From Swiss-Prot:
Alphabetical list of InterPro entries matching this protein: MECDP_synthase (IPR003526), MECDP_synthase_CS (IPR020555), MECDP_synthase_sf (IPR036571)
Its EC number(s): 4.6.1.12
Cofactor entry: a divalent metal cation
Record HAMAP family: IspF
Protein name (database record): 2-C-methyl-D-erythritol 2,4-cyclodiphosphate synthase
Binding site for 4-CDP-2-C-methyl-D-erythritol 2-phosphate: D12, V13, H14, H38, S39, D60, I61, G62, F65, P66, D67, T68, D69, R146
Binding site for a divalent metal cation: D12, H14, H46
Gene that this sequence comes from: ispF
Function: Involved in the biosynthesis of isopentenyl diphosphate (IPP) and dimethylallyl diphosphate (DMAPP), two major building blocks of isoprenoid compounds. Catalyzes the conversion of 4-diphosphocytidyl-2-C-methyl-D-erythritol 2-phosphate (CDP-ME2P) to 2-C-methyl-D-erythritol 2,4-cyclodiphosphate (ME-CPP) with a corresponding release of cytidine 5-monophosphate (CMP).
Feature type site, description Transition state stabilizer: H38, T137
Gene Ontology molecular functions: 2-C-methyl-D-erythritol 2,4-cyclodiphosphate synthase activity; metal ion binding
Pathway the protein acts in: Isoprenoid biosynthesis; isopentenyl diphosphate biosynthesis via DXP pathway; isopentenyl diphosphate from 1-deoxy-D-xylulose 5-phosphate: step 4/6
Record field: catalytic activity: 4-CDP-2-C-methyl-D-erythritol 2-phosphate = 2-C-methyl-D-erythritol 2,4-cyclic diphosphate + CMP
Length: 162
C-alpha cells in the first residue's frame, strides 16, 4: 500500500545522576544532576529520533547508534538526530510535525521549551510551528516522581517526499 503519511512514536528514559550535565532537547539546563547514558543522554532527542526512524520503518536509535559502539560515547544527540533525519529523507519521507512530552518532576522544563523547539525544528528541517513540547510532572509518583529519572514521549508525522 502506498500511503501518503506515516506516524511514529518514541519513548526514552534515563536515570538522573550526579556529575553529569543535564541536556534535554539540545539545551543544557542548570540542575544538580544530569542524565546517565552512553551518549549525552538527551532523553527528548532520543525519543524524537526513535519516533522519526519508527515512522519511516527504519527501526530505532539503538540499531543506528548502538550504545555498545565506542564511536557514540558522549555523542551529541543533535548530531544523531540530524543523521536520523537524513536516513528518513533518504527512505523517501519528510518530517511534518513532532509533538513531545517531557516527564520530569524537576527541573521545570517550560522555561527551556522554546530553545528545545528551535533545536528540534532546525535539526528536523521543519518550521518551529510544527514542533510542540509539553512538560508534565508525575505528581510525585514512581521513579519519575521521586526525581530518579526523566522520560520523554514523542509522536511524529511523516509525509511521503515528493
Amino acid at each position: 500500500m502506498n500511503v501518503p503519511f506515516r506516524v511514529g512514536q518514541g519513548y526514552d528514559v534515563h536515570a538522573l545522576v550526579a556529575g553529569r550535565p543535564l541536556i534535554i532537547g539540545g539545551v543544557t539546563i542548570p540542575h544538580t544532576h544530569g542524565l546517565q547514558g552512553h551518549s549525552d543522554a538527551d532523553v527528548l532527542l532520543h525519543a524524537v529520533t526513535d519516533a522519526l526512524l519508527g515512522a519511516a520503518g527504519l527501526g530505532d536509535i539503538g540499531r543506528h547508534f548502538p550504545d555498545t559502539d565506542p564511536a557514540y560515547r558522549g555523542a551529541d544527540s543533535r548530531v544523531l538526530l540530524r543523521d536520523a533525519v537524513a536516513k528518513v529523507r533518504a527512505a523517501g519521507w519528510a518530517p511534518v510535525n513532532i509533538d513531545a512530552t517531557v516527564h520530569a518532576q524537576a527541573p521545570k522544563i517550560g522555561p527551556h521549551a522554546g530553545a528545545m523547539v528551535a533545536n528540534i525544528a532546525a535539526d528536523a528541517g521543519i518550521d518551529s510551528a510544527s514542533v510542540n513540547i509539553k512538560a508534565k510532572t508525575n505528581e510525585g509518583l514512581g521513579y519519575l516522581g521521586r526525581k530518579e529519572g526523566i522520560a520523554a514521549t514523542v509522536v511524529a508525522l511523516l509525509a511521503r517526499a515528493s
